[in-house]
């Protein structure tokens, strides 16, 4: 494994950094003011997106693209440091058409959409003309086990009929959101025969303006109301043509992995960027502030916090780069890769809450205010412990993989023991 940036990676990172510092970062205060005034998206965002596309800084997060589609086809490893850069501003990714959940939805459509679906949905997403959302979690069941999902899909002749309720659907309140990808229980598709519940669900492409689709509310998270939305949505007798079914009936869980793996990696790298910024802000703060006749940076507990954060960020970055590298390898063990992606999800959430919490403590009361990005970083980090599945589900997946590996290695591990029986039976060399 070699994580050192390639020449291509360095070129694109430099271009992205120059654009970010010249055009995006100077608009940060204006973005917040616009959102506070109820104007979303801010009027300058379209100009920034057009400029980024003109400079080729577009769809940076997609390793594969259709012929003629705008983008760079950077590998996951090449995109990782760019994602870290963009993570410093939560809204920056949209400038480059790399924002969640659209990036994951585009990955899904790239793999499974037919020609009609690609023209209808994928092309405008790739061009940044529309936004989308992915509807999985539900309010009345434990969504951490996706086999519990109850939103139903039935067939009335050639018509697909959806009924149910989803919530915490990111992006659904965006004015440009046109597509809702819904995971639903297929009541009469081929998936109904599966006993363990993992081939009973299908994915359906639902236009946001379809009759029966109703956004009930935008749910605040820790008193933060995201302008793009984390919405509760009612699907009441939504009727669609057969072309709305994405991929095979009953294959929703397997298909969803196409978006969750890279998506979790992108979330993780953006977390690294936010943690780096939090640490830099905290270091600058304690160097300039004095208490009890000394700079705050001179206190040993503050130095411990800084050192712990530095070590944790570097450790997490190495894990994420390793996972990005493995995602790029065609021959990677899928079980190991699934465990790595789960580890990324857990580590990124833990890192962000711990590093940002220390930074807030070093800032003092100002760290709790909207005057710095720290309060938002902390609330987003806390949400990461639950989004895309709670930490405990991912830890369970990691443990199961480790236990399977241990079972396969049982015989070879016996030689490491020195029990009385083994001491009495030395091996023969000849």
What are these regions (language model features)?
Residues 148, 210-239:
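Flexible, small-/acidic-enriched active-site or ligand-binding loops
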Residues 74, 144-147, 172-177, 194-199, ...:
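Short glycine/proline-enriched turns and hinge-like loops at secondary-structure junctions
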Residues 94-116, 145:
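N-terminal glycine-rich flavin-associated loop
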Residues 1-90, 99, 112-117, 124, ...:
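Alpha-helical interface subdomain recognition
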